[in-house]
């Protein structure tokens, strides 16, 4: 009886348009089409690295609910249009570019003044419409990232000091626009219970659909490699046992509790030198201590309570090795 699993031998890529392709893989063992298809789809949508505008500063604008004279779009729509520009950076993680346009006409992504290592994938994308006398002066910060990052997360980050007029954008870095998959029946010789995986992938143009699926597969392999390495690690039974960590406050001398001299001397007479020694004693045990009355006991309880401790607590492995008496 054959025990080895089938691996796909037929991989076909069919172009469905610009940046849109259908990838067909077969044969898979029954169930593996859904297992791998769903995993690849989730990685493609959430874990691919891309580029997006993250901050915008518009001359004459203080906040996103403003309007600009001579610009048909309000600032909210202007920002939405800017988020639709697809950027690609080469050998750097962030860059700031400028968009300046005056006079009547249409403003497109092709009007953005780019650095030599920055590229616009969709230069015909419309950003705004200017009327006679209209003017637009915009600074756009582009960053490399992964997935989707809401603007409020970045706005309150440690390196995002408030700058008047700067607008922080929600950033969708993923270069993958849409992914769907279907599992169909496949046949190999006499076997008809196999799966065929069909994936439809559409990207923004930063990467091709074929490269997107290659990258997602590499991400999955890298994540699963941790499980493959389990055979070379110590088992729980073989791992050396470690003593539980002891709260440092328990290792401090009772003198640190700043008790009255009478109470402190009574404790030391009973060989109670550390706070860890003290909390393991009960009230009845302490009341049997010579010269330690109810008043001293209440003092001890109050001081311990102020540190989140009580009498009668149980400690394992006490006293720890090397603790001087």
From Swiss-Prot:
It catalyses: RNA(n) + a ribonucleoside 5'-triphosphate = RNA(n+1) + diphosphate. InterPro entries: DNA-dir_RNA_pol_insert, DNA-dir_RNA_pol_RpoA/D/Rpb3, DNA-dir_RpoA, RBP11-like, RNAP_asu_C, RNApol_insert_sf. SUPFAM superfamilies: C-terminal domain of RNA polymerase alpha subunit, Insert subdomain of RNA polymerase alpha subunit, RBP11-like subunits of RNA polymerase. Keywords: DNA-directed RNA polymerase, Nucleotidyltransferase, Transcription, Transferase. It comes from the Bacteria. Its EC number is 2.7.7.6. GO terms for molecular function: DNA binding; DNA-directed RNA polymerase activity; protein dimerization activity. Residues 1-231 are annotated as: Alpha N-terminal domain (alpha-NTD). Pfam families: RNA_pol_A_bac (PF01000), RNA_pol_A_CTD (PF03118), RNA_pol_L (PF01193). Residues 246-325 are annotated as: Alpha C-terminal domain (alpha-CTD). GO terms for cellular component: cytoplasm; DNA-directed RNA polymerase complex. The keyword Manganese does not apply. GO terms for biological process: DNA-templated transcription. Homodimer. The RNAP catalytic core consists of 2 alpha, 1 beta, 1 beta' and 1 omega subunit. When a sigma factor is associated with the core the holoenzyme is formed, which can initiate transcription. DNA-dependent RNA polymerase catalyzes the transcription of DNA into RNA using the four ribonucleoside triphosphates as substrates. Belongs to the RNA polymerase alpha chain family. The N-terminal domain is essential for RNAP assembly and basal transcription, whereas the C-terminal domain is involved in interaction with transcriptional regulators and with upstream promoter elements. This is DNA-directed RNA polymerase subunit alpha.
């Amino acid at each position: 009886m054959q025990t080895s699993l089938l691996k796909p031998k037929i991989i076909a890529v069919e172009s469905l348009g610009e940046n849109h392709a259908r990838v067909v893989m077969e044969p898979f063992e029954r169930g593996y089409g859904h297992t791998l298809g769903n995993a690849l789809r989730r990685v493609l949508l959430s874990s691919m690295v891309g580029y997006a505008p993250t901050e915008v500063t518009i001359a004459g604008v203080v906040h996103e609910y403003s309007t600009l004279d001579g610009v048909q779009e309000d600032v909210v729509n202007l920002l939405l249009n800017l988020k639709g520009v697809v950027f690609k950076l080469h050998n750097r993680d962030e860059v700031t570019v400028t968009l300046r346009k005056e006079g009547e006409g249409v403003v497109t992504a092709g009007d953005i003044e780019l650095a030599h290592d920055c590229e616009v994938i969709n230069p015909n994308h419309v950003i705004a419409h200017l009327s006679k006398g209209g003017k637009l002066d915009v600074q756009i910060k582009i960053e490399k990232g992964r997935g989707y990052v809401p603007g409020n997360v970045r706005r309150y980050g440690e390196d995002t000091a408030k700058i008047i007029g700067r607008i922080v954008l929600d950033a969708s870095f993923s270069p993958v626009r849409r992914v769907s998959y279907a599992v169909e029946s496949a046949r190999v010789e006499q076997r008809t219970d196999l799966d065929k995986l069909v994936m439809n992938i559409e990207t923004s143009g930063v990467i091709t659909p074929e490269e997107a699926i290659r990258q997602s597969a590499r991400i999955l392999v890298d994540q699963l490699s941790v499980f493959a390495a389990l055979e070379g690690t110590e088992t729980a039974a073989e791992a050396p046992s470690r003593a539980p960590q002891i709260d440092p406050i328990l290792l401090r001398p009772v003198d640190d509790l700043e008790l009255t001299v009478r109470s402190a001397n009574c404790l030391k007479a009973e060989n109670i030198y550390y706070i860890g020694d003290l909390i393991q004693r009960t009230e009845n045990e302490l009341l049997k201590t010579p010269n330690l009355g109810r008043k001293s006991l209440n003092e001890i309880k109050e001081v311990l309570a102020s540190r989140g401790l009580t009498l009668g607590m149980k400690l394992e492995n006490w006293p720890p090795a090397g603790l001087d008496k």
